């Protein structure tokens, strides 16, 4: 019975969020079980382009370090904000969501050549958080019961938290930068006088991922409750 409930809950996660989160968990599990090592996964331009280890372009986004607080923290944020984006502003637009993944991954890989980062998964998570926060500007957040703020400040609060933990903020800044580029090109520039939509999802992605029918049993994660693990519950201003 418990297995069936977990299975149904798992299958209710939208496809892109389910696939990416599962890939991250399985990759970490494989490293933890010593089936593979991080040295086989990290981003290394020389190994990619000279030795054709193309898989590193993907695997460096899937490993978040050994199982521990940092891994759990990243997985919770990745799952929650990836799912809320897919069920919110990308509802019924799976191809556009996949294209955002590809565009963000491409920019991070390009910038990664200059900032010497070997794993980009955390930056990718911050990008998702940034896009969600800009598209939900009136949602109020609570940071461990200590700090109240509106959603657009969330990426910066997370960066400050990383700084307090003694981590490098380069990863957070990269995620914020890529998230802002996507948000500007997709949401801001097209609505300016004379603006055009530069980011157009290729028709092949639409043919593969977009389906005309919507599942009547779909149970979305409420976008107005972004608090989640250890954050308290978010609430809209005026609500």
From Swiss-Prot:
Disordered as annotated region, ranges:
215-239
Instruction: Tell me which InterPro entries the record gives.
Output: DER1, Rhomboid-like_sf
| Principal subcellular localization | endoplasmic reticulum
Q: Name one GO cellular component term.
A: endoplasmic reticulum
Cytoplasmic-facing ranges? 1-57, 118-150, 194-239
Chain intervals with Gly residues compositional bias:
229-239
Transmembrane ranges?
A: 58-78, 97-117, 151-171, 173-193
**For this protein, what is any one GO molecular function term?**
signal recognition particle binding
**Biological process annotations from GO:** endoplasmic reticulum unfolded protein response; ERAD pathway; negative regulation of retrograde protein transport, ER to cytosol; positive regulation of cell growth; positive regulation of cell population proliferation; retrograde protein transport, ER to cytosol; suckling behavior
Q: Give the tissue specificity.
A: Ubiquitous. Overexpressed in various hepatocarcinomas.
Provide the membrane topology annotation. Answer: Multi-pass membrane protein
Keywords from the UniProt entry:
Endoplasmic reticulum, Host-virus interaction, Membrane, Transmembrane, Transmembrane helix, Unfolded protein response
**Induction, as annotated:** Up-regulated in response to endoplasmic reticulum stress via the ERN1-XBP1 pathway of the unfolded protein response (UPR).
> Which parts of the chain does the record assign to the membrane side Lumenal?
79-96, 172
Where does this polypeptide localize? Endoplasmic reticulum membrane
* Subunit structure comment from the entry: Forms homo- and heterooligomers with DERL3 and, to a lesser extent, with DERL1. Interacts with the SEL1L/SYVN1 and VCP/SELENOS protein complexes. Mediates association between VCP and EDEM1, as well as that between VCP and the misfolded glycoproteins. Interacts with OS9. Interacts with SELENOK and SELENOS. Interacts with the signal recognition particle/SRP and the SRP receptor; in the process of endoplasmic reticulum stress-induced pre-emptive quality control. Interacts with CCDC47.
Family of this protein: Belongs to the derlin family.
Q: What does this protein do?
A: Functional component of endoplasmic reticulum-associated degradation (ERAD) for misfolded lumenal glycoproteins, but not that of misfolded nonglycoproteins. May act by forming a channel that allows the retrotranslocation of misfolded glycoproteins into the cytosol where they are ubiquitinated and degraded by the proteasome. May mediate the interaction between VCP and misfolded glycoproteins.
Q: Which PANTHER family does the entry link to?
A: DER1-LIKE PROTEIN, DERLIN (PTHR11009)
What is the official name of this protein in its record? Derlin-2
Encoding gene per record: DERL2
């Amino acid at each position: 019975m418990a297995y069936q409930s977990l299975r149904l809950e798992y299958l209710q996660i939208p496809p892109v969020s389910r696939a990416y989160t599962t890939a991250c968990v399985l990759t970490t599990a494989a490293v933890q079980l010593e089936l593979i090592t991080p040295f086989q996964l990290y981003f290394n331009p020389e190994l990619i382009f000279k030795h054709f280890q193309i898989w590193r372009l993907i695997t460096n986004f899937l490993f978040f370090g050994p199982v521990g607080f940092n891994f759990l923290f990243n997985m919770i944020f990745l799952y929650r904000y990836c799912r809320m984006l897919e069920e919110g502003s990308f509802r019924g637009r799976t191809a556009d969501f996949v294209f955002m993944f590809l565009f963000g991954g491409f920019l991070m890989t390009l910038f990664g050549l200059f900032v010497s980062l070997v794993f980009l998964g955390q930056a990718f998570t911050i990008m998702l958080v940034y896009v969600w926060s800009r598209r939900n500007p009136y949602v109020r957040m609570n940071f461990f019961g200590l700090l109240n703020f509106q959603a657009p400040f969330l990426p910066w609060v997370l960066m400050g938290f990383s700084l307090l933990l003694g981590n490098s903020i380069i990863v957070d800044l990269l995620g914020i930068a890529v998230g802002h580029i996507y948000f500007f090109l997709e949401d801001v520039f097209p609505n300016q006088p004379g603006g055009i939509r530069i980011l157009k999802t290729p028709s092949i992605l639409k043919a593969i991922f977009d389906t005309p029918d919507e599942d009547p049993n779909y149970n979305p994660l409420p976008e107005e409750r972004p608090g989640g693990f250890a954050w308290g519950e978010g609430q809209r201003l005026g609500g």
